[in-house]
């Protein structure tokens, strides 16, 4: 037993060294601090992402509940914890400590990995947010670019409309010029008709003059019959005729000048008409060039339509690809859901295994690592799905760009259709104008034909007049011949001279009239050629107008067909746009569904991480509970062993005390008056208060010195404390400790004092000893062993009472010879010694476990 106490004391001394003063209470505190640090590490990334905040908010009540669950274990006294830790340290193997340290390091590493994964996840989420912001900025830029393109296209369309309007205005101006030229031609025709009327009037005047000349000639013939009588009258008539001839010459000259001027005017007008017709030909050629340009535009539109068809087919192929990719994403999501379900099932199984048995901790750790790997794979799949989503968003952006391009092309086609419709309306207006012009020209043609017929009639009339003039000349010549014959018959030479003069005059007049007729014929030929040229020009212009009308009709028909085809293509493009919009909406919906599913996957991942954290926390709790139970079990075993040792020691001490009491009783039977010396037992009991006084004097020292002093006392056997020879040994130990011969002086003083004083001093010393023991007990153990000590004190007191009863019975048997006073004094002494022995036994019992510790 002494060896056991020595080993326990050596263990306590090693644990109470300066380096390990606080070591007994450290293991459980360290575990709690580790758990707190782990919770703090788990909570630390909560400031990074909203998902981790959710996880923190979910895990915080669990952590609080875990702290609340652990809190009832805290009121355990530090004395018991120190004892348990000392016992555990005495029994624990280094393998368990290394295993615990490895487990802690693994847990720290796992927490660090989880925190790093959460940080990476937060970074990935931030990058996704940044990518979304950049995508929004790009969409805004694209919108701005599209707006700018729309503005440019609107400006270009406005410029095109302005150019078309300018061309239309130029055409209208040309038409107005043509109208003006037609009006000038009409005016020229009117002037020509007026000139013809004037010529007719002049011819009528000439005819009248010729009729007057015929009358004069008849008068001259009548007068020539009586030539002899009226020669003078004939001479006057000749003068009159000569004057008339001069007047006729003047009239002919004026008519010639007028006809030359009118001919020059007609030539100038015809040249102007030729220039106008050339301009019309140039405008017609320009119109043909415009028609060719429009045909090129129509061809370009057909090419654009083919490109739109190709884009439509590409859009269909892209939509099919997106549908296939969406199906693949749905399959991947289903696989992810299956993996999550399997992960939840595995987590439930892990929880059941953790709740069921503590032996399967290693299996649960391996499953946790598998779950981490699955989480990593899930995160990689989520990252891949996010990349696929980004690619899909990019492709959707490209599809939207193509759709916007198609919309722009459709708008362009609509604008071109509107322009074509406007041109069609204008062409219809031009056709109406052309028809009206044709009608007007036909009316003018009919007028010109009527004028030509009238001019022909006038020519015939002029021919008839010329014939009448020729007949008149023949008549005049016949009359001259008759007059000549008469004159010859009469034989008057004067008349012959007159007749010669008349012949000359007649020849001159004939020549003049012939010249006038030639000129009139030439003028008539010129007018006929001009009329024929005007007819030819009118017919050619009519043919040109008919050709233009036919071309316009054909062009209008073509334009109507093109408009119809363009309308059909526009309807088809509208349907395609609607389909593409529907497909885009479906793609957006699918993308939103995939995003929602991804969010659900992320939430489930967060929930899995939370469940992993909870599982880890529960596993830590279970490990702590196991360690606590093991320590409690070991402490209970050590307490049982200590109690057994204490029982053995107490039994031995009780036996020793009973022997001491018997010896004391036997010694008291001897006469107390011999030499006034104290008994051996009283001397031994006097030594104990001195030791207690020494410990009380040095109570300000550390606990280590007290424990060392108690060791020196407890290592001695109880028989040495009682015997006289050993009392000297105790005195030697006290001398070695204090370096002074206090015991010998105290013995001498005690021999001089009386027994009552010794008893009072012993009572005071026992009281001090009791107080010092109470102080040591408070320093060593706070409050928890009071019940055990009270039970032990009651047992010791009961045993002491039994021993006292036996001793009193022995005294009653042997001490009948004593007086009553002696009996009273003996009873008082026995009671005092009883109390002293009980208190000393309690002190020794209380100090024994301290020394063992």
UniProtKB/Swiss-Prot annotation:
The modification Phosphoserine is found at residue 790. The keyword rRNA-binding does not apply. Residues 92-101 have a biased composition (Polar residues). It comes from the Eukaryota. Belongs to the WEB family. Keywords: Chloroplast, Coiled coil, Phosphoprotein, Plastid, Transit peptide. Residues 1-84 form a transit peptide. Its main location: plastid. It is found in: Plastid, Chloroplast. Gene3D superfamilies: 1.10.287.1490. It comes from Arabidopsis thaliana (Mouse-ear cress). The keyword tRNA-binding does not apply. This is WEB family protein At5g16730, chloroplastic. Residues 754-763 have a biased composition (Acidic residues). Residues 1-27, 36-49 have a biased composition (Low complexity). Residues 1-106, 386-465, 666-765, 778-820 are annotated as: Disordered. Residues 402-465, 698-718, 732-753, 778-788, 797-807 have a biased composition (Basic and acidic residues). GO terms for cellular component: chloroplast; microtubule associated complex; plastid.
């Amino acid at each position: 037993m002494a060896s056991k106490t020595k080993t326990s004391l050596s263990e306590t001394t090693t644990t109470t060294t300066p380096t390990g003063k606080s070591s007994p209470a450290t293991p459980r505190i360290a575990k709690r601090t580790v758990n707190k640090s782990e919770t703090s590490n788990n909570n630390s990334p909560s400031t990074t992402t909203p998902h981790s905040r959710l996880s923190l908010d979910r895990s915080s009540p669990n952590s609080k509940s875990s702290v609340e669950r652990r809190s009832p274990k805290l009121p355990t006294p530090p004395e018991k914890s120190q004892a348990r830790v000392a016992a555990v340290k005495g029994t624990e193997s280094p393998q368990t400590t290394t295993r615990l340290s490895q487990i802690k390091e693994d847990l720290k590493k796992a927490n660090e990995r989880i925190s790093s994964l959460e940080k990476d996840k937060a970074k990935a989420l931030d990058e996704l947010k940044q990518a979304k912001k950049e995508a929004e900025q790009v969409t805004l830029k694209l919108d701005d670019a599209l707006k700018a393109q729309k503005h440019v296209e609107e400006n270009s369309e406005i410029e095109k409309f302005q150019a078309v309007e300018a061309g239309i205005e130029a055409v209208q101006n040309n038409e107005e010029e043509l109208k003006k030229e037609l009006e000038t031609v009409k005016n020229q025709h009117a002037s020509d008709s007026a000139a013809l009327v004037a010529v007719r009037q002049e011819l009528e005047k000439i005819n009248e003059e010729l009729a007057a000349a015929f009358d004069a000639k008849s008068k001259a013939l009548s007068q020539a019959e009586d030539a002899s009588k009226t020669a003078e009258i004939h001479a006057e008539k000749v003068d009159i005729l000569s004057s008339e001839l001069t007047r006729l010459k003047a009239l002919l000259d004026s008519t010639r000048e007028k006809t030359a001027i009118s001919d020059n005017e007609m030539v100038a007008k015809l040249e102007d008409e030729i220039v106008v017709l050339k301009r019309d030909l140039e405008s017609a050629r320009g119109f043909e060039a415009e028609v060719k340009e429009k045909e090129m535009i129509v061809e370009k539109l057909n090419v654009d339509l083919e490109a739109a068809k190709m884009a439509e087919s590409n859009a269909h192929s892209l939509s099919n690809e997106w549908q296939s990719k969406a199906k693949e994403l749905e399959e991947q999501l289903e696989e992810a859901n299956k993996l999550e379900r399997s992960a939840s099932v595995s987590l439930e199984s892990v929880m059941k295994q953790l709740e069921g048995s503590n032996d399967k901790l290693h299996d649960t750790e391996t499953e946790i690592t598998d779950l981490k790997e699955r989480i990593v794979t899930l995160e990689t799949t989520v990252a891949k799905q996010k990349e696929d989503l980004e690619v899909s968003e990019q492709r959707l952006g490209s599809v939207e760009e193509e759709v916007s391009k198609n919309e722009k092309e459709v708008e362009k086609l609509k604008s071109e259709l509107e322009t074509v419709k406007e041109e069609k309306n204008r062409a219809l207006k031009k056709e109406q104008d052309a028809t009206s012009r044709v009608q007007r020209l036909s009316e003018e043609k009919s007028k010109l034909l009527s004028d030509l017929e009238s001019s022909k009639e006038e020519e015939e009339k002029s021919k008839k007049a010329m014939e009448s003039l020729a007949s008149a000349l023949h008549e005049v010549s016949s009359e001259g011949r008759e007059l000549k014959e008469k004159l010859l018959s009469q034989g008057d030479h004067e008349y012959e001279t007159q007749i010669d003069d008349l012949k000359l005059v007649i020849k001159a007049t004939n020549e003049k009239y012939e010249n006038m007729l030639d000129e009139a014929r030439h003028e008539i030929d010129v007018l006929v050629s001009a009329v024929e040229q005007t007819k030819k020009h009118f017919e050619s212009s009519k043919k040109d107008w008919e050709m233009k009308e036919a071309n316009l009709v054909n062009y209008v028909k073509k334009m109507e067909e093109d408009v119809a085809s363009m309308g059909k293509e526009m309807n088809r493009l509208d349907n395609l746009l609607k389909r593409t919009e529907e497909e885009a909406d479906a793609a957006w919906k699918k993308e939103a569904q995939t995003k929602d599913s991804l969010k659900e996957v992320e939430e489930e991942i967060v929930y899995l991480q939370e469940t992993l954290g909870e599982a880890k926390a529960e596993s830590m709790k279970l490990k702590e509970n196991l360690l606590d139970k093991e320590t409690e079990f070991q402490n209970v075993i050590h307490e049982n062993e200590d109690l057994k040792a204490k029982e053995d020691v107490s039994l031995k001490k009780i036996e020793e005390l009973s022997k001491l009491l018997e010896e004391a009783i036997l010694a008291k039977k001897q006469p107390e008056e011999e030499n006034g010396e104290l008994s051996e037992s009283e001397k031994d009991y006097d030594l104990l208060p001195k030791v207690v006084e020494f410990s009380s004097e040095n109570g300000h020292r550390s606990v280590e010195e007290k424990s060392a002093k108690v060791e020196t006392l407890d290592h001695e056997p109880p028989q040495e404390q009682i015997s006289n020879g050993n009392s000297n040994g105790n005195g030697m130990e006290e001398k070695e400790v204090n370096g002074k011969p206090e015991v010998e002086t105290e013995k001498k003083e005690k021999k001089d004092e009386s027994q009552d004083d010794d008893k009072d001093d012993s009572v005071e010393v026992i009281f001090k000893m009791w107080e010092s023991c109470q102080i040591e007990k408070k320093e060593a153990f706070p409050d928890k062993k009071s019940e055990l000590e009270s039970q032990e004190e009651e047992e010791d007191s009961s045993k002491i009472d039994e021993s006292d009863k036996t001793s009193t019975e022995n005294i009653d048997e042997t001490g009948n010879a004593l007086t009553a006073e002696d009996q009273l004094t003996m009873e008082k002494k026995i009671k005092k010694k009883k109390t002293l022995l009980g208190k000393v036994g309690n002190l020794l019992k209380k100090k024994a476990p301290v020394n063992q510790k």
